[in-house]
Amino acid sequence: MEENKQRVKSMINILQLVAPGTPLREGIDNVLRAQTGGLIVLGYNEQIKSIVDGGFHINCAFSPASLYELAKMDGALILNETGSKILIANAQLVPDSSIDSIETGMRHRTAERVAKQTGSLVVAISQRRNVITLYQGNLRYTLKDIGVILTKANQAIQTLEKYKAVWNDGITNLGILEFEEVVTMSEVVHVLHSVEMVLRIKNEILSYIHELGTEGRLIRLQLTELLADLEAEAALLIKDYHQEKTQDHHQILKKLQDLANTQLLEDSDLVKLLGYPGQTSLEESVTPRGYRITSKISRVPPLIIENLINRFKTLQGVCRATINELDDVEGIGEVRAKKIREGLKRIQEHLYMSRHN
């Protein structure tokens, strides 16, 4: 899984470097439109030096226009790692010919071998096929047309909306069962599955946003709006039901996101994520601590909620507490005690109304 995370991180960094709106992408697009083809290497370390033959050492500031003009020559362009300087123009690259390559064209074969040999980012711009291919180490990625990515991103947003509705239904039903004291592991796992799917689609949309660059601003806004409060509530759900109260619920949610990015999770995986043995029955009754529900009461800060849970242990304990018992909790006076009682009653009524609508 660590290897996959590193791979994803590398791809994000690469896509951000050549995303629409960046000077480098503007220059690459100019070369693509001119149909001259081109080979661009980012980074000039000892390994690159050993395979560069000839060329003009110009060491000038990067500009899209300069890239376009210099790409008219047959050789490769060598840039610094950040793409802010053009170091060498018209360079001949001589990588180790024994390195395997799946490419057929000379330009792309050279690009793949240079990337594998040096680990540097190499951009190959096809002369006839209007395709931009990125290579780094064993990574190979073909940039898609912006229109295609936008279509896929919008489809993913629509799918996310559907799973958000599934989450809303599940979390409403769970809230009602919490007040009725009849929650089983099955209901908790069901809600966590909807969180898993939301996070899986979020990861996919983020990859589109990275590739879209400045063109992905609206998609990012939609994603932010759709996920507003969902992840925070999911973290509190984990805090409510994890076997160990002291576990960092945000870290567990992050672990869920990492797992969602690599595989479809079984019920037993989610049960284990909550600190229980994988063979735990889904019909087993579980009791919420009450962090999620009490956080919905207005003007009750997290420190007071922590004091409440420490005193009454569970949501049921908080609900059954009298005004005097609530008043005894540190930080809660008589006025706030009444607000907590009224707040819990309003939340319960709202949940019942939501279920019948």
UniProtKB/Swiss-Prot annotation:
The gene is disA. Residues 8-146 form the DAC domain. ATP binds at residues 75, 93, 106-110. Homooctamer. One of its GO terms (molecular function) is diadenylate cyclase activity. It comes from Bacillus cereus (strain ATCC 14579 / DSM 31 / CCUG 7414 / JCM 2152 / NBRC 15305 / NCIMB 9373 / NCTC 2599 / NRRL B-3711). Coiled coil: none annotated. Participates in a DNA-damage check-point that is active prior to asymmetric division when DNA is damaged. DisA forms globular foci that rapidly scan along the chromosomes during sporulation, searching for lesions. When a lesion is present, DisA pauses at the lesion site. This triggers a cellular response that culminates in a temporary block in sporulation initiation. Also has diadenylate cyclase activity, catalyzing the condensation of 2 ATP molecules into cyclic di-AMP (c-di-AMP). c-di-AMP acts as a signaling molecule that couples DNA integrity with progression of sporulation. The rise in c-di-AMP level generated by DisA while scanning the chromosome, operates as a positive signal that advances sporulation; upon encountering a lesion, the DisA focus arrests at the damaged site and halts c-di-AMP synthesis. Gene3D superfamilies: 5' to 3' exonuclease, C-terminal subdomain, DNA integrity scanning linker region, DNA integrity scanning protein, DisA, N-terminal domain. InterPro entries: DisA, DisA_sf, DNA_integrity_DisA_N_sf, DNA_integrity_scan_DisA_link, DNA_integrity_scan_DisA_N, DNA_integrity_scanning_protein, RuvA_2-like. PANTHER family: DIADENYLATE CYCLASE, DNA INTEGRITY SCANNING PROTEIN DISA. Its cofactor is Mg(2+). It catalyses: 2 ATP = 3',3'-c-di-AMP + 2 diphosphate. It comes from the Bacteria. Keywords: ATP-binding, DNA damage, DNA repair, DNA-binding, Magnesium, Nucleotide-binding, Nucleotidyltransferase, Transferase. This is DNA integrity scanning protein DisA. Its EC number is 2.7.7.85. Belongs to the DisA family. One of its GO terms (biological process) is DNA repair.
